[in-house]
Amino acid sequence: LVESEGIVMDRTVSSQYDKMTKTPIEKLIISLGIPTIVSMLITNVYNMADTYFVGRLNTSASGAVGIVFGVMAVLQAFGFMCGQGAGSSMSRKLGEKDIESASYYASTGLAMALIMGLIIGGFGLLFLNPFMRLLGSTDTILPYARQYGMCILIAAPFMTGSCVLNNILRYEGKAIYAMVGLTVGGILNMIGDPIFMFAFHLGTLGAGISTAVSQIISFGILLYMVKTKKTVSKVCLRFVKLSIGMMVDISTIGFPSLIRQGLSSISTMVLNQMAAPYGDAAIAAMSIVGRMSMFIFSVGLGLGQGYQPVAAYNFGARRYDRVKQGMIFTFWLGTILIGIFSAVTFVFTRPLIRLFRDDQEVVEFGFLAMRVQCISLLTQSFVLNASMLFQSCGKRFIAAMMSLFRSGIMFLPLIVILPRFLGFVGVQIAQPIADVLSCIGSIPFVLRFFHQLDKSMEEMNV
């Protein structure tokens, strides 16, 4: 029986290896990218559902969603650090046909994420008021932010854990299973929002409860998918290795994701604080613009996440030609998809903002910001895939630099300086300018790495 199971496992590993290293690159990336794009869009739809339903209450409540978005960004930062770090290392080990090491990375990454979620959730609940203030709450927004944020912090371990399970499935080329878990959670949240908020008369608290419950259910489904042998690598206590070496390895590979998501959280805080002098309507408007921009960005992000396991697997298998070919294909397809969504949003900017909050002041605050963002998002497919390329190939430092560009090095100085000279227009255009500059800054790194891949291929042929 043991021998029979071993033969089945060997066939599974061989089949997975052939799929990731021999399937035509365009077909492979699209097959992995479509479920991930669907997952990302649904995740963003249910985030936007909170914005939509809470927007039915009042402008201050709508602003609270933008404040608590910073909490979710913090949790996702640590969740994706563990998930991307474990997933990238795991996928490269599978490319080398080292299943035991892959299982250690997967199991340890999940354990780290759960522990971090517990710590962040505990401290957040203990210091709830100061935390919400730090994120940019005004006196009128604070009561709503407390209610919504409390629920998110209670569900924190499940949110961070889901990030890892999602990445384990994706990096093994099983994106369809990850899509199921995220989709069910998203649909439940969209159904739960109006029930808890209006049928049970819980308002913002109801939106928080709905989001927390949907996150817990998503975690359960993703864990079930991993535990029912949908993956080659194993996730169990036996493979948890909380040694300094293992945790540092996962953390350093995943560090670019921590930077990307963490700086997104910091950027949201600073953006809210710079918008605060212009009132709750300004905070609500920038929150809506942020959600709409993320919806468009998620199309490219989903496709890029479809490319990640391809890059990691083939880099481990020394198929550098496929790593390079995949990056170029994903960049162009991502730009086209983002362009389509941006064009629609550009044309219907006012009606779309009004859909979330029918307040003329909110619409006017958000109009210019959204339109300029639609144009600048066209540059982000390149930046996004450059960061994912380096992270998947284990190039820690360069991947971290890529992540620093958009939300850190470029954005933070701009959001502090521009409003001093341009007023609220400076708040509106800071992110679009940062997007363009980050794209320009990324180009030399990618060209240099492509040259290194070409050189490695020449040496292998010799």
Label every model-predicted segment.
Residues L1-G33, M90-P157, A199-F255, A311-S376, ...:
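Short alpha-helical transmembrane segments in multi-pass integral membrane proteins
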Residues L41, V45-G63, M132-D139, I195-T204, ...:
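Helix-terminus/linker motif at the lipid-water interface of multi-pass membrane proteins
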Residues S62-G122, M159-A178, A285-T349, Q380-M402:
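Small-residue-rich hydrophobic transmembrane alpha-helices
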Residues K22, E26-V45, A49, V71-F78, ...:
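Residue-level signal for short hydrophobic patches within transmembrane helices
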Residues S31-N47, C151, G185, S214-S218, ...:
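Transmembrane helical elements of multi-pass membrane transporters/channels
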Residues G83, I152-R170, A178-N189, A207-G220, ...:
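Short runs within selected transmembrane alpha-helices of multi-pass transporters and secretion channels
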Residues V74-A77, N189-P194, F219-L223, F295-S298, ...:
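Hydrophobic transmembrane alpha-helices of multi-pass small-molecule transporters
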Residues M40-N44, A77, G117, G121, ...:
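Residue-level hotspots within the lipid-embedded alpha helices of multi-pass solute transporters
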